[in-house]
Amino acid sequence: MATYAVLGSTGNTGKCLVELALQQPNAKVHAYCRNKTKLTNQLPIIIDNKRVEVFEGSIYDVDLFVDCLRGCRAVFLTITTNDNVPGCHMSQDSVRTIIAALVKLKKQQGPSGTIPKILLLSSATIDEHLNRDMPGWFKPIMKAAASNVYDDLKVAEQMLRAEDDWLTTIYIKPGGLSLDVQRGHKLSLDKQESFISYYDLAAAMIEAADDVEGRYDMKNVGVVNANGGARFPPGTPMCIAVGLLRHFFPWLHNYLPSTGPA
């Protein structure tokens, strides 16, 4: 019986992870969120579900994370944002708390305990191998449109790689994402594709976590479609445009709308 911790369970990826994990017989979910009411409104299937335990609280609460991560096979770290927030540090803060929690959990469990794998949701845009086929004119636009988010992810990755002598991390790096149905996916160490549905991304993350051979451990992993691409998200042009404004004119941040791929 596998138990998965989903950190960021109210986000698009997090919600899909919870749904797909619960489709597995006997699988359990530890869902972390900052607002339980928001989570239950978005995912009513978890209400009174004995296979789901919700952990509500601050991203800086180490003891809460210790309880959330205890007994888990894998930790899906999906705490991020679609907005190019100046000075974004959500991923760094999450990783810092996770590492502190796992250090504490390791001490509590002793040498016989097991530490869960971490699957960090990152981006193919910051992987020059996976994104090598991205049009040369478009790549700098994307890097600027989400520059603050990518800088945050880069630091988070560095923090996790610095602990690779005792922590196993899988770096999931999809291309563009879409609110679409699940069509089928493939994991790849060589390619990425846009657009991927959030459901296919979630399924790919679960597959990587469950791989008994550890083929994806400590690697950058792309996701490609197996049965046709996801639809183009109509919110993408606005998301890019507003992201560029936040990149070049960060003082405009509070006056700009929140955007997303929908």
Swiss-Prot record:
<protein>
    <recommendedName>
        <fullName>Oxidoreductase GME11367</fullName>
        <ecNumber>1.-.-.-</ecNumber>
    </recommendedName>
</protein>
<keyword id="KW-0560">Oxidoreductase</keyword>
<comment type="function">
    <text>Oxidoreductase; part of the gene cluster that mediates the biosynthesis of dibenzodioxocinones such as pestalotiollide B, a novel class of inhibitors against cholesterol ester transfer protein (CEPT). The biosynthesis initiates from condensation of acetate and malonate units catalyzed by the non-reducing PKS pks8/GME11356. Pks8/GME11356 lacks a thioesterase (TE) domain, which is important to the cyclizing of the third ring of atrochrysone carboxylic acid, and the esterase GME11355 might play the role of TE and catalyzes the cyclization reaction of the C ring.</text>
</comment>
<comment type="similarity">
    <text>Belongs to the avfA family.</text>
</comment>
<dbReference type="InterPro" id="IPR016040">
    <property type="entry name" value="NAD(P)-bd_dom"/>
</dbReference>
<dbReference type="InterPro" id="IPR036291">
    <property type="entry name" value="NAD(P)-bd_dom_sf"/>
</dbReference>
<comment type="pathway">
    <text>Secondary metabolite biosynthesis.</text>
</comment>
<dbReference type="GO" id="GO:0004497">
    <property type="term" value="F:monooxygenase activity"/>
</dbReference>
<dbReference type="Pfam" id="PF13460">
    <property type="entry name" value="NAD_binding_10"/>
</dbReference>
<keyword id="KW-0503">Monooxygenase</keyword>
